Amino acid sequence: MTAQVLVAQHVVAGYAPGLPIVQDASVEVGPGEIVTIVGPNGAGKSTLLKAIAGEVLFESGTILLDGRDVAGLPAHEMVRCGIGFVPQTGNVFTNLTVAENLVVGGHILPRAELKRRLARAYELTPFLGERRASTGRLLSGGQRQILAVARALMTDPKVIMLDEPTAGLAPRAAGEVFAHLRRLAGTGVAVLMVEQNAKAAIRASDRFYVLAQGRNRMQGRPQDLADDTAIGEAFLGRGKASS
């Protein structure tokens, strides 16, 4: 069995000491795999990603990246360790060109390495190369999200995490984002995302987790689902908590 790139176990995290939003959540993702976390509003999905990325208060649990314990490291150290994080807004600078946005993502790189990774970004996502001189405001919503992903990839992460990458997008644009993530996973990058559109996201994934009330309620593979009943129960917190 291929070793998992990211293993987070029994994570407790939040925004203030003693007030955890994530109360006991676990997730794993392997190389070239797309894993999605779904659940109701307030379940702790985004907070779990931010805890792994070092952006909120980590209270307890284990986070291993290629076997190395990185739990509790600050965000800038997580980037250096190999975690890329795309927040819900994408944070594309609409006044900057596509090329300038990518340079921002790789600002810590030596000049020669930055040039090499720009070329790789354009190879993986040809339309970015074609529109490298266009500003972010001229891109569609789906294209901006793909640019945000490409920018996070400039540091060559082992795993890329995305917080609701299709939020606010029309179904066609959302499908383009999911298709891009599948191509990305095909290069060996581990993909972990949080999504509100559970049905579409699960279909686009290799595995999924359902969180409710800050805890794991269900996990599985899309092909194992006979219908939506079990997921609905898990959303309501009726599923058996699992690690």
Where are the regions that the model predicts?
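A short, flexible loop at the N-terminus of ABC-type nucleotide-binding domains that lies
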Residues: 1-8, 12-24, 31, 36, ...
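ABC-type ATPase nucleotide-binding domains, specifically the catalytic core motifs of the NBD
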Residues: 16-17, 98-116, 124-129, 133, ...
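The feature captures the beta-strand-to-loop junction immediately N-terminal to the Walker
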Residues: 38-40
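Conserved ABC transporter NBD signature motif
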Residues: 61-68, 81, 114-118, 220
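Conserved ABC ATPase signature
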Residues: 135-139
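ABC ATPase C-loop
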Residues: 152-153
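Catalytic Walker B motif of ABC-type/P-loop ATPase nucleotide-binding domains
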Residues: 160-164
